[in-house]
């Protein structure tokens, strides 16, 4: 590794200043090459990793505090979907050549706030200089009772398809970032625009649903790459999702956008970055699941059923017209 620039701290000083204060038990203040973590008796560890890259998953001009919250939040969303509670995380940070201490201080502060809110301390990682855009890779470690992890592929024909929160806000927020003068989105009131932009910047992992998913869900995943595409990932093997478009929950801001331009409904149904929980529950269990989720502060909607058959999810409009959405799940390649 090359020497630090005169106006920047070296790697050891950088870690001590910005990341050691975030370290949890077992990390030894980030002074060692590894950390230790022991699950509680009768529990399994659940591990997940996601990377975000400047110019791909976030805008380089985004506030560093928001970038940090997103990097941790998208990983904790995966833990929630598996029914796990967060225990800790590892961080690998690739800094772009033009990084500044001000950016790093904001990033560290955002991580500290998010980690404290979610009860998820830092255990270790790596900090390097990237040859290109900045990247952040987080490995999140969660815990759940042994043998209780909720798989993606457990749905059965007849199960009810459920989703938490609202769908499409983040995709519409991204559309607003990419084309702020776009006809329909530009006509939204500032409050509605702010809601959509915030949902894109700040995913909210639905950790409160984790214990309920273990009890009720036959399958679960988070909606990261778009509702339509993620439904396709969850099905297969003789199962096909049959979705009632009118039952897909949209926020008031998203409804205003769709009312201004009906084509934006497809953006909402296929766009990514929702980080809501998509799950299936056995018939007859949906009412109890929704009631307990509401008591935990998370609204859940029943949007369809698992049918027999193959193919992409079938969306039925209020007029009774069934259709497949052309856009599928987001793919990097």
Model-derived regions: residue spans:
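Glycine-rich anion-binding loops of enzyme active sites
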Residues: 39-41, 45, 52, 87-180, ...
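Glycine/charged-rich beta-loop-alpha catalytic/anionic-binding loops adjacent to active sites
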Residues: 52-61, 144, 190-196
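Glycine-/charge-enriched secondary-structure boundary and capping motifs
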Residues: 1-20, 63, 95-123, 128-136, ...
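Small-aliphatic-rich amphipathic alpha-helix that forms the alpha element of a beta-alpha
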Residues: 64-88, 109-117, 208, 212, ...
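Short coil/turn connectors at secondary-structure junctions
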Residues: 25, 31-32, 41-44, 84-88, ...
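Helix-rich terminal scaffold detector
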Residues: 187-190, 202, 250, 259-261
């Amino acid at each position: 590794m090359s020497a630090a620039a005169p106006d920047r701290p070296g790697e050891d000083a950088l870690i001590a200043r910005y990341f050691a204060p975030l370290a949890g038990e077992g990390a030894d203040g980030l002074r060692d090459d590894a950390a230790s973590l022991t699950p509680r008796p009768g529990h399994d560890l659940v591990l997940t990793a996601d990377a975000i890259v400047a110019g791909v998953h976030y805008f380089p001009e985004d506030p560093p505090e928001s970038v940090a919250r997103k990097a941790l939040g998208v990983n904790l969303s995966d833990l929630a979907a598996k029914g796990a509670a967060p225990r800790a995380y590892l961080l690998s940070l690739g800094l772009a050549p033009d990084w500044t201490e001000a950016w790093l201080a904001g990033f560290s502060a955002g991580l500290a706030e998010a980690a404290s809110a979610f009860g998820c301390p830092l255990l270790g990682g790596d900090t390097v200089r990237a040859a290109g855009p900045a990247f952040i890779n987080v490995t999140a470690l969660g815990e759940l009772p042994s043998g209780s992890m909720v798989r993606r592929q457990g749905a059965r024909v007849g199960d009810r398809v459920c989703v938490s929160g609202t769908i499409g806000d983040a995709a519409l927020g991204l559309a607003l970032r990419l084309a702020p003068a776009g006809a329909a989105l530009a006509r939204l009131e500032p409050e509605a625009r702010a809601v959509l932009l915030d949902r894109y910047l700040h995913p909210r992992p639905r950790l409160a649903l984790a214990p309920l998913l273990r009890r009720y869900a036959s399958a679960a995943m988070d909606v990261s790459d778009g509702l339509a595409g993620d439904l396709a990932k969850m099905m297969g093997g003789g199962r096909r999702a049959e979705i009632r478009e009118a039952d897909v929950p949209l926020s008031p801001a998203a409804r205003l956008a769709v009312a201004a331009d009906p084509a934006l409904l497809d953006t909402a149904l296929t766009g990514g970055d929702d980080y809501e929980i998509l799950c299936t529950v056995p018939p007859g269990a949906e009412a109890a699941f929704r009631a307990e989720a509401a008591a935990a502060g998370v609204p859940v909607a029943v949007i369809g059923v698992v049918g027999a058959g193959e193919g992409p999810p079938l969306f039925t409009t209020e007029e009774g017209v069934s259709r497949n959405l052309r856009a599928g799940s987001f793919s990097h390649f």
